[in-house]
């Protein structure tokens, strides 16, 4: 059988493209998909995030029904139909995942979390190295081979889901086409049109607050909002002198940026002697904030916080997923049990005094 015209064009592009990526780490393009049967957690029934390496560039859920860019990728000079195509493809995957969840519920008692990690990276010759693995309730149970068009695995549930999807018209062909053709096309497109986004730098805005602690102490919370890249260094100052970095944590926002906070226990009544300072790639010099005095970087902090209320500021699995993607683990499976369920909610473990209020993690409309 002859190769289709799009396939010929892609092959020529992969051959003719200068080998400029060879000297640098090759970024994978990955989609993390998840569907749940138990909606009591307040999560959507289906959601997806798209990643270029450890940088999130896309979000989608069944409530909004549109694929949206994240972070600096909002300004990527994409072709006009690109996000419509992403939306169409993710709606198809949403249908497959939700049908699988319903079928599992009908045949097996229990609740289910079905996840997929689909994507590709470019081999040294710029051909596609596809990934298509699936997990059920936090454990890998199935793989898809795009060259044979088969879903396979050792679990009984593999037969249930795999046979269901094999019966769907064109499902295997579309999945193979996505992994071998569409995915490398998109990855090349992002590298060509949005290469500068990989060097995106967004400076943080900050605030420092205090709350009562135990045994006559106070707890200072230094929070940094809406910054990228995620590496950020905290420092507490007492009367202008370094007084430690506190206990620090970092997590992703749903818009591709990050938030972080650090906690320091001090003597009650001593709070106003302290300042908080951060160092970040997006800042020309360290940014320092006094207690209860919002600092300004390149954008007023009020605008940053208000903006957080208007965008999707938390993606399901955000904290745990980002940490696993960044650490290079093979699959960011979430079990939706124990502590994992907390990582699926807005803002991770951001302290209440540092978190913008009134945020809906999955708004149905923009």
From Swiss-Prot:
Cytoplasmic side: which ranges? 323-366
Q: Which residues form the signal peptide?
A: 1-22
Which residue ranges does the record annotate as region Disordered?
Answer: 344-366
Q: Where is this region: Connecting peptide?
A: 293-298
Ig-like C1-type domain spans which residues?
203-290
- Stretches for region Alpha-3: 202-291
Q: Which cysteines are joined by disulfide bonds?
A: 120-183, 222-276
- Membrane topology qualifier: Single-pass type I membrane protein
Q: What's a GO cellular component annotated to this UniProt protein?
A: extracellular space
The principal localisation class reads membrane
Tell me the domain of life.
Answer: Eukaryota
Localisation per UniProt entry? Cell membrane; Endosome membrane
Annotated region (Alpha-2) at 112-201
Describe the function of this protein. Answer: Cell surface receptor that transfers passive humoral immunity from the mother to the newborn. Binds to the Fc region of monomeric immunoglobulin gamma and mediates its selective uptake from milk. IgG in the milk is bound at the apical surface of the intestinal epithelium. The resultant FcRn-IgG complexes are transcytosed across the intestinal epithelium and IgG is released from FcRn into blood or tissue fluids. Throughout life, contributes to effective humoral immunity by recycling IgG and extending its half-life in the circulation.
Q: What is this protein called?
A: IgG receptor FcRn large subunit p51
Species: Rattus norvegicus
């Amino acid at each position: 059988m002859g190769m289709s015209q799009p396939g010929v064009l892609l092959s020529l592009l992969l051959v003719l493209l200068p080998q400029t990526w060879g000297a640098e780490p090759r970024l994978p393009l990955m989609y993390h998909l998840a569907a749940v049967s138990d909606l009591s957690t307040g999560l959507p029934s289906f959601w997806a995030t798209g990643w270029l390496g450890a940088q999130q560039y896309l979000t989608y859920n069944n409530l909004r029904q549109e694929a949206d860019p994240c972070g600096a990728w909002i300004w990527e000079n994409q072709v006009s139909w690109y996000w419509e195509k992403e939306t169409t493809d993710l709606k198809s995957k949403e249908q497959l995942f939700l049908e699988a969840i319903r079928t599992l519920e009908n045949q097996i008692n229990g609740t289910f979390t079905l996840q997929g990690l689909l994507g590709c990276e470019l081999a040294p010759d710029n051909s596609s190295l596809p990934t298509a693995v699936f997990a059920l309730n936090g454990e890998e149970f199935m793989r898809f081979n795009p060259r044979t068009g088969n879903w396979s695995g050792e679990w009984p549930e593999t037969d249930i889901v795999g046979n269901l999807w094999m019966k769907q018209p064109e499902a295997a062909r579309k999945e193979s086409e996505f992994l071998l053709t569409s995915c490398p096309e998109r990855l090349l497109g992002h590298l060509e049109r949005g290469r500068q986004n990989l060097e995106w730098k967004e400076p943080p805005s900050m605030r420092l607050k205090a709350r009562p602690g135990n045994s006559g102490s106070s707890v200072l919370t230094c929070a940094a909002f809406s910054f990228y890249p995620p590496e950020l260094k905290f420092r507490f100052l007492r009367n202008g002198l370094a007084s430690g970095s506190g206990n620090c944590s970092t997590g992703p926002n749903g818009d591709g940026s990050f938030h972080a906070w650090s906690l320091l226990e001090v003597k009650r009544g001593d709070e106003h002697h302290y300042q908080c300072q951060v160092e970040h790639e997006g800042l020309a010099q360290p940014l320092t904030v006094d207690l209860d005095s919002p600092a300004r970087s390149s954008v007023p902090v009020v605008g940053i916080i208000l903006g957080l209320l208007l965008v999707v500021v938390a993606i399901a699995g955000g904290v745990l997923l980002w940490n696993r993607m960044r650490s290079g683990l093979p699959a960011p499976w979430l079990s939706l049990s124990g502590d994992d369920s907390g990582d699926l909610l807005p803002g991770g473990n951001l302290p209440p005094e540092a978190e913008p209020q009134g945020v809906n993690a999955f708004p149905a409309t923009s």
